Swiss-Prot record:
GO terms for molecular function: arginyl-tRNA--protein transferase activity; leucyl-tRNA--protein transferase activity. InterPro entries: Acyl_CoA_acyltransferase, Asp_Glu_LeuTrfase, N-end_Aminoacyl_Trfase, N-end_Aminoacyl_Trfase_C, N-end_Aminoacyl_Trfase_N. Its main location: cytoplasm. NCBIfam families: PRK01305.1-1, PRK01305.1-3, PRK01305.1-4, PRK01305.2-3. Keywords: Acyltransferase, Cytoplasm, Transferase. It is an enzyme of class 2 (transferase). HAMAP family: Bpt. This is Aspartate/glutamate leucyltransferase. Functions in the N-end rule pathway of protein degradation where it conjugates Leu from its aminoacyl-tRNA to the N-termini of proteins containing an N-terminal aspartate or glutamate. It catalyses: N-terminal L-glutamyl-[protein] + L-leucyl-tRNA(Leu) = N-terminal L-leucyl-L-glutamyl-[protein] + tRNA(Leu) + H(+); N-terminal L-aspartyl-[protein] + L-leucyl-tRNA(Leu) = N-terminal L-leucyl-L-aspartyl-[protein] + tRNA(Leu) + H(+). One of its GO terms (cellular component) is cytoplasm. Its EC number is 2.3.2.29. It comes from Dinoroseobacter shibae (strain DSM 16493 / NCIMB 14021 / DFL 12). It is found in: Cytoplasm.
Length: 285
């Protein structure tokens, strides 16, 4: 099914499929292609409205009877690490960061497979081969970086580990107002390092150094064990009812179904604000 606006681009909706976050529910996504010379402008604009990027597609949950998935971002100016997060930073003080072009490597894929097998063996990415992994990393029409984290030789907890062994990876988009952590994975053997939390903390620092106000974390789902850690970051905002707002008490947000609060697809599309820099002929399309 296709839904169009008087302004380009065009938006589509996926067929319902089982929700990966809440058992017994069905998910549906609203999406549009991300391509051409205005891809970055569109990515910047729609990211502010709760969309996420996957390769050359921007998508947002548009479920028929559920509004549980909420886009989340950290307001860098309002962030202060907790005691637990300060300990995580201290434990990873010798971790070395390197930002590279979005180019997939065998080391990355090996770590990716190890991470999936340990943490998400039944997930939608479980069967991803190296070519699909390369597409996930490399097929980006916007400004993206691969941020790698490696342990220094002195920090390796096991003498048998190779120096500077790859410990974590994050595919990151650079937006006009922040960093978007598109996908991250890490060595599941390094449990004590809390690498998932550390990479978020490090991206907050990168954003602060770059003068960018936000770090986009993807979706937060109330009560979801997979998503609960995101609510532990101070300065967290969620995109709800068409605007960004402080998360407040995480327990106050319900994941009950709300069929009467879900606008029809055509109305959802009509409410999307498109960037003003699209060329006139496309906007009239």
């Amino acid at each position: 099914m296709r839904h169009t606006l008087p302004l380009a681009p065009q938006f589509y909706v996926t067929a319902p499929q089982p929700c990966p976050y809440i058992d017994g529910r069905m998910e549906r996504k609203l999406f549009t292609a991300l391509q051409g010379e205005f891809a970055e402008t569109l990515n910047d604009s729609l990211s502010k409205q709760g969309f996420r990027r996957s390769q050359n597609v921007l998508y947002r949950p548009s479920c028929a009877d559920c509004t549980a998935c909420l886009s989340a971002r950290i307001d860098v100016s309002a962030f202060t690490p907790s005691r637990s997060q300060r300990r995580t930073l201290k434990r990873n003080a010798v971790m070395e960061r390197e930002a590279t072009s979005p180019w997939a490597t065998e080391d990355q894929y090996s770590l990716f497979r190890k991470y999936l097998d340990a943490r998400h063996a039944e997930g939608g990415m479980a069967d991803m081969d190296i070519f699909e992994f390369a597409a996930m990393i490399e097929e980006t029409p916007v400004r993206s970086r691969v941020v790698e984290y490696r342990q220094s030789a002195e920090a390796a907890p096991n003498r048998k580990r190779a120096p500077r062994n790859l410990a974590g990876v994050c595919l990151t988009d650079v937006l006009d107002d922040g960093l978007s952590m598109v996908y991250s994975f890490y060595d599941p053997d390094l449990v004590r390092q809390s690498l998932g939390t550390f990479m978020v903390l490090d991206h907050v620092e990168i954003a602060r150094e770059a003068g960018l106000p936000y770090v986009y974390l993807g979706y937060w789902v109330p009560g979801s064990p997979k998503m609960g850690y995101k609510a532990s970051f101070s300065g967290l905002e969620i995109y709800k009812n068409g605007e960004w707002q402080p998360i407040g008490d995480p327990e106050s947000h319900s994941r009950d179904t709300h069929p009467l609060n879900v606008d029809p697809i055509a109305e959802q599309v009509a409410k999307i604000n498109l960037p003003d820099t699209l060329p006139t002929d496309r906007r009239k399309g």
